[in-house]
């Protein structure tokens, strides 16, 4: 059904997507999961221990905005490299991603590399949110790398000096080389940088002048419903993402793992209880606010389409953090229906809903 109804233009703006590899997400996820072995009838799959087995899938998408950013890169003859970027750590391992981007383009000592983020005295900082951390930091970092390559080539003026950049600078008795760059989203001008300096904002997207930029994900999940307690567990999940170029596969995979756990917990555990008399929260600690635990979730397999999006930004990447949450809860609901024949439409899905 999904493969036969894959719409390409953005239904809201009518503009084409910058990239949309939903078909690849679905086919790769189905192959990894073994979707072809699925029995279609609800309640038709049973585990050896008597648990009802359900397989479900769903798609998710999320806007891919971009924040303007400033990056300053300094390489010294003393073996030190320092890059300051507009951006900060939101849990995705952004320092690792920035370092990977820099080290892929410049021959510098990684042991002497310092990545400075979240410091307004070094660079203006944008908002925390909207999955635009990497999409802001990395294009600016990549631009700084290319500017440094050009500056180094001009400085060397055709001379061939052995060794890495630190050794080359030391050989020609240059204490350091520094560049500063700024990067804006498609369709933005220099005023976006000034707005960033003043307000700490200035993000654009997902609708740009010529296109709309979105990230996409396909989730395939298996749930097992215990026959007596009706407790729901998820022994495995396969999630395949179209997020453009993947700069740091290890940290990107970790983001998807965390997002799937977040989605499972939201779908089956988490809910705030409000006092109807006074409006206060009744479950404001982890003793009362239920969350997922290790026993609830088994293997989480993550895949990427690995196709850069050259329209979205100079780095070819799109947002990743929050797209993982989109669609995962729906896939779990579909799997519960496949296991039990009950269509649950209000989260969290709890044991009492299956009694």
Mark where each language-model region is:
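Thiamine diphosphate
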Residues: 94-102
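C-terminal catalytic domains of large/alpha subunits in multi-subunit enzymes
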Residues: 1-51, 55, 101-355
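Short acidic alpha-helix initiation/capping motifs at coil-to-helix transition points
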Residues: 92-95, 328
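Conserved beta-alpha junction segments in alpha/beta enzyme cores
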Residues: 54-80, 85, 92, 206
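A short, ordered amphipathic alpha-helix with a cationic face
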Residues: 88-90, 322-323
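A generic structural motif
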Residues: 87-89, 243-244
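Residue-level recognition of well-ordered beta-strand positions that form the cores
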Residues: 60, 74, 84-86, 224, ...
